[in-house]
Amino acid sequence: MILGVHSATFVKNWHEDAKPYIYLCKKAGYKSVEVSLLGQTPSGAKEIAKLANDLNISITCTTGLSNEEDISSSDPVTQQNGVEALKRAIDMTSIMQAKLLTGVVHAAWGISNSMGKDKEDKFKNSSHSIKKITSLLSEKNIKFGDRATQ
């Protein structure tokens, strides 16, 4: 078993540099750190990958979708925005040399504007959108998981 911790345990905002906290996690004995992709840049992702390699600590990645990127939406443009956001997240996960991407990715983060209505349509839209990223996940050898909101 690998015991890890989410870098959000330490940060004050999603865009904060996670590298200092990766050091803290290693020092505390963790073997893995989950890093939010929100606010990450490709150059920052490369630095995180190098640091993780130097410290012999694994990285997993997490992200979320905005209302404008809601893959469960009935609006095709919004769905496509979400697919593109997930593709960027997959690329960033790969840059960090991580093998797992998770988060609230079946829909937009937060409470749905439909307040529980149209769940079957939302499920179909989400599923259809996720199918569009499976080949990229496979190509990059990244596992994908969803954290459903409560």
What residue spans do the PLM features occupy?
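Active-site mouth loops of central-metabolism enzymes
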Residues: 3-17, 69-83, 115-123
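Active-site beta-loop-alpha junctions enriched in small/polar residues
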Residues: 8-10, 36-40, 64-67, 106-108, ...
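Acidic-and-aromatic substrate-binding clefts and catalytic sites of carbohydrate-active enzymes
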Residues: 11-16, 35-47, 70-72, 111-113
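Short, acidic/polar
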Residues: 12-25, 47, 78-91
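Catalytic domains of carbohydrate-active enzymes, especially glycoside hydrolases
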Residues: 19-41, 89, 95-100
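Aromatic-lined substrate-binding rim segments of carbohydrate-active enzymes
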Residues: 44-56, 64
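Active-site acidic/histidine proton-transfer and metal-coordination neighborhood
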Residues: 53-54, 76-150
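Non-cysteine beta-strand/loop elements that form the S-adenosyl-L-methionine
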Residues: 58-65, 102-104
